[in-house]
């Protein structure tokens, strides 16, 4: 019986044909992504594109079932595709890259997909994909897990809540989804030091018989087995140094971790196209440590002091190791284990140009790290794949007549809705009318040819937009990426410059606002500039978007007043430029900022709606000096 027989029975022949012709994007091939890839392959999606920036690490293997020890340091996306080939019946296209990289993944690249699955572990990328979904009206299945908690949320642009419709509180825990090959924050280095390095040296079982013929190496290929044994021996070699209690060999650990391994990462050129390269330690730093006194827990010290502390504390733990039956557990209240994690994390931070932290700060962070759970990933991925059939309206017995009839899913603890069952599945809510992403502005995509970008003057561009959407004479135009004022009725300095000369380009987002009306105004529109070299010359195609007249709201609503009193700020600001590496985890501070809504310099113009403005600077930041390419900022 063909594999698809049961699926055809459930969804019908016509829906099965639609499914086979569907093209989906899976962003993330880690914990949830591995499970999702397996699920959507078995569901017979016709074409699946997989994007992931990361490479495989040892810590991934306990829950990311598509990967084996032989795959360590290999790209997740391409390795996952190879791992599923034996049961695959879909066209699979892997990419190793940052989904927020506009040069690799321009907006028109996303247009080919029927649905997007998010399996990400970082907030900036989630927000970015959510905005792409809103600009292109593409359905998005958002998901996430943290330990035993998880959730899944279908997002239908314009019909249901988007990712930004609900506030994202700063998490009190730090989910361990991967151990980064490209750390960008102190937390990444602390996770590496605590969950990988410390466990490998002091808490893992000693090596068994590495030549055991019954050992499952994940392959029958003799060369591959040889390579796996080599990798395994390298890891066990560090532990052998600990077992030997030979303090003179501690510099070998430093050399392996902070010189050899860093050089291996540097050899993977794709990792460093958009980020600063790490700088490994030097032999002289390792071999000439300074003698330092015990430093205070609230001080950081120099990198040389960190190296000396690492050597000293490793020697202490070496002496403890046999006394504790060759197994030491990390405990944040154990001064020795905490000191080891702190020094290792700080050395790694220094190498990756990340600020070092005091032992006191690291104790607070390391004590809150929770592990990822494979079962939670599988449950959330299963719910995501099943709901996609309803999002695409492929179930005849449960047709989707109204998108708010679709369900999201939360674990009981995460949802606070019911403790009587593991999963709660409330129906989707309509968009939050105060959401700055999906409700406060209209959205669209401007298709531009490269020559048009270089020839069209700003004044002509403004006229084109004003006439297309029936805006009055008094308008303002902002570069929403960094809140630069480009044009308004008393600022026309840039009118004779071309779009490229004022640093507008592929991926730029502009905000066009009505500044004239007192009672009724034209709703603001946010436009994404999609520059495509394959478009005909002089192409500047504006989207067919209905921009309605709305009531001017110059005074804060009741909800806004309550929020202001509660939070002490006019608006929760979101960052509009991602970090150089595009890797951000859920412990990012959601900064708050108060924006002065009073007219500036005596102007009688209506102030910019602070909920539309998503960057921590006022709209009247004027570009007066000659523009430079460095001013171009990608969308968060």
UniProtKB/Swiss-Prot annotation:
Subcellular location: Nucleus
SUPFAM superfamilies, per database record: Activating enzymes of the ubiquitin-like proteins
Motif Nuclear localization signal: where in chain: 619-622
PTM field: Multiubiquitinated in vivo.
GO molecular function: ATP binding; metal ion binding; SUMO activating enzyme activity
Any one annotated GO CC term: nucleus
Variant or mutagenesis effect after changing residue 177 to A/S: Loss of function
Biased composition (Acidic residues): 586-595
Main location group: nucleus
Domain of life per record: Eukaryota
Ranges where the record places region Disordered: 581-636
Keyword Nucleus: yes
Any GO BP: protein sumoylation
Binding site for ATP: 28-33, 52, 60-63, 76, 121-126
Composition bias, Polar residues: 626-636
Catalytic center residues: 177
Pfam families xrefs: ThiF (PF00899), UBA_E1_SCCH (PF10585)
This protein's UniProt keywords: ATP-binding, Ligase, Metal-binding, Nucleotide-binding, Nucleus, Ubl conjugation, Ubl conjugation pathway, Zinc
Residues involved in Zn(2+) binding: 162, 165, 435, 438
Keyword Ubl conjugation: yes
Known function: The dimeric enzyme acts as a SMT3 E1 ligase. It mediates ATP-dependent activation of SMT3 and formation of a thioester with a conserved cysteine residue on AOS1.
Subunit structure: Heterodimer of UBA2 and AOS1. The complex binds SMT3.
Family the entry assigns: Belongs to the ubiquitin-activating E1 family.
Note: Present with 18800 molecules/cell in log phase SD medium.
Protein name: Ubiquitin-activating enzyme E1-like
UniProt source species: Saccharomyces cerevisiae (strain ATCC 204508 / S288c)
């Amino acid at each position: 019986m063909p594999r698809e027989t049961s699926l055809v029975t459930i969804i019908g022949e016509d829906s099965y044909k639609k499914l086979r012709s569907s093209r989906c994007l899976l962003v993330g091939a880690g914990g949830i992504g591995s499970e999702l890839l397996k699920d959507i392959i078995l569901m017979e999606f016709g074409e699946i594109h997989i994007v992931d920036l990361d490479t495989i690490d040892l810590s991934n293997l306990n829950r990311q079932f598509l990967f084996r020890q032989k795959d360590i340091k290999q790209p997740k996306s391409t390795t996952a595709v190879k791992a599923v080939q034996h049961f695959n019946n879909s066209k699979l296209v892997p990419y190793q890259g940052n989904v927020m990289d506009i040069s690799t993944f321009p907006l028109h690249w996303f247009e080919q997909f029927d649905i997007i699955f998010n399996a990400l572990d970082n907030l900036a990328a989630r927000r970015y994909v959510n905005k792409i979904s809103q600009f292109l009206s593409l359905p998005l299945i958002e998901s996430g897990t943290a330990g035993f908690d998880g959730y899944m949320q279908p997002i239908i642009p314009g019909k249901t809540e988007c990712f930004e419709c609900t506030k994202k509180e700063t998490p009190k825990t730090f989910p361990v989804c991967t151990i980064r090959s490209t750390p960008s924050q102190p937390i990444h280095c602390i996770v590496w030091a605590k969950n990988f390095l410390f466990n490998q040296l002091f808490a893992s079982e000693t090596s068994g018989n590495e030549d055991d013929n019954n050992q499952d190496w994940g392959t029958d290929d003799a060369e591959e087995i040889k390579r796996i044994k080599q990798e395994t021996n390298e890891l066990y070699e560090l532990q052998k140094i600990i077992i030997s209690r030979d303090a003179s060999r501690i510099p070998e650990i430093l050399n392996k971790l902070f010189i050899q391994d860093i050089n291996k990462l540097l050899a993977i050129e794709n990792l460093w196209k958009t980020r600063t390269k790490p700088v490994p330690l030097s032999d002289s730093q390792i071999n000439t440590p300074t003698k330092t006194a015990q430093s205070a827990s609230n001080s950081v010290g120099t990198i040389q002091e960190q190296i000396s502390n690492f050597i000293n504390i490793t020697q202490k733990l070496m002496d403890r190791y046999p006394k504790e039956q060759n197994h030491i557990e990390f405990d944040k209240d154990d001064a020795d284990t905490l000191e080891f994690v702190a020094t290792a994390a700080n050395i790694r931070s220094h190498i990756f140009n990340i600020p070092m932290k005091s032992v006191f700060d690291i104790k607070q962070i390391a004590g809150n790290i929770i592990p990822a759970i494979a079962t939670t990933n599988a449950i959330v991925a299963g719910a995501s794949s099943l709901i996609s059939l309803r999002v695409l309206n492929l179930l005849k017995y449960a047709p989707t007549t109204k998108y708010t009839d679709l369900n999201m899913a939360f674990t009981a603890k995460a949802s606070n809705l019911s403790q009587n069952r593991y999963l709660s599945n409330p129906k989707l809510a309509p968009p939050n009318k105060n959401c700055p992403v999906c409700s406060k502005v209209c959205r669209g995509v401007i298709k531009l040819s490269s020559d048009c970008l270089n020839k069209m003057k700003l004044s002509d561009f403004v006229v084109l937009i004003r006439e297309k959407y029936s805006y009055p004479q008094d308008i303002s135009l902002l570069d929403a990426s960094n809140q630069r004022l480009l044009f308004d009725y008393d600022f026309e300095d840039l009118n004779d410059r071309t779009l490229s000369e004022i640093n507008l380009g592929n991926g730029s987002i502009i905000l066009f606002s009505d500044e004239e009306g007192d009672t009724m105004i034209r709703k603001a529109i946010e436009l994404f500039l999609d520059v495509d070299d394959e478009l005909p010359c002089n192409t500047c195609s504006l989207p067919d978007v209905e921009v309605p007249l709305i009531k001017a709201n110059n005074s804060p609503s009741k909800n806004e007043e309550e929020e202001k009193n509660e939070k002490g700020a006019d608006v929760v600001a979101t960052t509009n430029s991602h970090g150089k590496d595009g890797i951000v985890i859920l412990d990012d501070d959601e900064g708050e900022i108060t924006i002065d809504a009073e007219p500036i310099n005596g102007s009688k113009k209506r102030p910019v709606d602070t909920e539309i403005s998503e960057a921590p600077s006022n709209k009247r930041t004027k570009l007066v000096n000659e523009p430079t390419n460095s001013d171009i900022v990608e969308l968060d």
